[in-house]
């Protein structure tokens, strides 16, 4: 049965989160009564309020009001006063993925999974479907620059969603097409073991109906291994791997643009197709890989080669995905969400390939549990940065773990052989180091899923203030 409109008020706890805000926005646009609360008055909260959605800042039992249903972010604990109040009133408690599944139930759906690259790949698929006049609904884990939001209504039959594997609820999503970009050691605090992560992604693919298909990146050993174990579903492989069904090759980069070709070979018919001289307005092989997943789906859905080329060339990117936010004396400043060693390594590799000068990385570790599980990987992921600045850990509600903090990470990176890694405490430290050591042509790259983005956005103005003060002193 389709979810009726007259179900009453839906209350979202943690509505300011990137995933929750998109779902709440779409339900509001569909005509449902929506409200919510969040601990922080952030940009997502303001966007929802501007659309007429009531959002309380802070979590309190009385925020529920006349709510009939309560939707919970994965970050909400059982000690949350709104959770407790909902339990006392015997209100249905709904997980974020369940609400997303309701939206997907009556459209043909593409779900993008993987431990990294989901947000960009989701955005690229949406862009190519848009270029092919599919007019898709989109719910993403990041702000799509072309839309100015992470949610898009769309009137077409297709829907594109980011499938968050962090708590296992992505297995609830009824997808016709499933994408797996990669599988790495992540969210072990939930899964308990990497074997459990592998099993979850296998189930994600096997949940695809017999008339659907999976799109798997076989450049990643774990995903190639997964592909070999899927024998009852249609699988399309992609990557730089010569054995991939959809293969990208002949890469060249010019600043923030990447040029490449794609060779496509159908397992069903044996037909071979080439797409040459593709232009992606982003740097980095990892972004070309993400684009190739989108091309694979667009091609399979019958979107013309010309529309694919046009959609790719016009792709506007995603907020906080190697986003240039300013410059100072020829030094380019970027902000990126990367917080896992694999993501950090890919971003810094892209920066190294496109920068004319050096790369200065400012990283804010996200969660003590992630540092604990991936400590050695973090020590080895900064090789493409000439200078590494490590900020205090963004705890995200976790308690510190002895021996796994920012200072210990700096020491571990040094022991792994990096020649210039430093501990910093605040934005003023960044201003001092960048103003002293950077030169025209250098890239400054902020990395992290916490509030490091605020430092990134503030740095250009802080450097301008430094210039003014320097000029004043000289006068």
Curated annotation (Swiss-Prot):
Principal cellular location given in the protein's record: cytoplasm
Primary enzyme class: ligase
Catalyzed reactions per annotation: UDP-N-acetyl-alpha-D-muramate + L-alanine + ATP = UDP-N-acetyl-alpha-D-muramoyl-L-alanine + ADP + phosphate + H(+)
Gene Ontology MF terms: ATP binding; UDP-N-acetylmuramate-L-alanine ligase activity
A UniProt-annotated Pfam family: Mur_ligase_C
E.C. numbers: 6.3.2.8
GO biological process: cell division; cell wall organization; peptidoglycan biosynthetic process; regulation of cell shape
Disulfide bonds: none
Binding, ATP: 114-120
GO cellular component entries: cytoplasm
InterPro entries, alphabetized: Mur-like_cat_sf (IPR036565), Mur_ligase_C (IPR004101), Mur_ligase_C_dom_sf (IPR036615), Mur_ligase_cen (IPR013221), Mur_ligase_N (IPR000713), MurCDEF_pg_biosynth (IPR050061), UDP-N-AcMur_Ala_ligase_MurC (IPR005758)
Pathway connected to this protein: Cell wall biogenesis; peptidoglycan biosynthesis
Signal peptide location: none
Keywords of this entry: ATP-binding, Cell cycle, Cell division, Cell shape, Cell wall biogenesis/degradation, Cytoplasm, Ligase, Nucleotide-binding, Peptidoglycan synthesis
HAMAP family assigned to the protein according to its UniProt record, in alphabetical order: MurC
Family, similarity comment: Belongs to the MurCDEF family.
Family annotation (NCBIfam families): murC
Role of this protein: Cell wall formation.
Protein name: UDP-N-acetylmuramate--L-alanine ligase
Organism: Bartonella henselae (strain ATCC 49882 / DSM 28221 / CCUG 30454 / Houston 1)
Gene (UniProt): murC
């Amino acid at each position: 049965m389709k979810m009726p409109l007259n179900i009453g008020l839906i209350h979202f706890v943690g509505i300011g989160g990137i995933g929750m805000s998109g779902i709440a926005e779409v339900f509001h646009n569909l005509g449902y009564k929506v409200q919510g609360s969040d601990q922080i008055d952030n940009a997502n909260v303001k966007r929802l309020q501007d659309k007429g959605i009531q959002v309380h800042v802070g979590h309190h039992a009385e925020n529920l009001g006349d709510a009939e249903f309560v939707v919970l972010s994965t970050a909400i604990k059982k000690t949350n006063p709104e959770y407790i109040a909902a339990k006392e009133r015997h209100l249905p408690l709904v997980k974020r993925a369940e609400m997303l599944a309701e939206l997907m139930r009556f459209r043909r759906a593409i779900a993008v999974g993987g431990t990294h690259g989901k947000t960009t790949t989701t955005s690229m698929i949406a862009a190519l479907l848009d270029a092919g006049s599919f007019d898709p609904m989109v719910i993403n884990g990041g702000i799509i620059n072309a839309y100015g939001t992470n949610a898009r209504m769309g009137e077409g039959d297709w829907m594109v969603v980011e499938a968050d594997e962090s708590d296992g609820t992505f297995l609830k999503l009824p997808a016709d097409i499933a994408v797996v970009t990669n599988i790495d050691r992540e969210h072990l605090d939930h899964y308990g073991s990497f074997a459990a992560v592998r099993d979850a992604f296998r189930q994600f693919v096997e949940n695809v109906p017999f008339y659907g298909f999976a799109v798997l990146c076989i450049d990643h050993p774990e995903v190639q291994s997964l592909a070999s174990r899927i024998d009852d579903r249609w699988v399309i492989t992609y990557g730089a791997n010569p054995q991939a069904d959809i293969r990208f090759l002949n890469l060249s980069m010019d600043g923030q643009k990447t040029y490449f070709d794609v060779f496509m070979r159908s397992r069903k018919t044996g037909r071979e197709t080439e797409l040459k001289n593709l232009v992606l307005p982003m740097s980095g092989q990892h972004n070309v890989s993400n684009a190739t997943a989108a091309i694979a789906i667009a091609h399979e859905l019958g979107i013309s080669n010309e529309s694919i080329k046009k959609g790719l060339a016009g792709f506007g990117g995603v907020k906080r995905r190697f986003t240039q936010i300013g410059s100072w004396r020829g030094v380019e400043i970027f902000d990126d969400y990367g917080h896992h060693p694999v993501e950090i390594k890919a971003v810094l590799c892209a920066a190294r390939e496109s920068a004319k000068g050096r790369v200065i990385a400012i990283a804010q570790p996200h969660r003590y549990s992630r540092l604990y599980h991936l400590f050695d990987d973090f020590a080895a992921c900064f090789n493409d940065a000439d200078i590494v600045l490590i900020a205090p850990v963004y705890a995200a509600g976790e308690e510190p773990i002895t021996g796994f903090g920012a200072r210990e990470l700096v020491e571990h990176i040094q022991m792994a052989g990096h020649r210039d890694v430093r501990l910093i405490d605040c934005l003023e430290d960044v201003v001092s180091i960048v103003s002293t050591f950077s030169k025209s042509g250098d890239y400054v790259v902020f990395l992290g899923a916490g509030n490091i983005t605020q430092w990134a956005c503030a740095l250009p103005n802080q450097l301008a203030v430094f210039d003014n003060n320097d000029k004043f002193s000289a006068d």
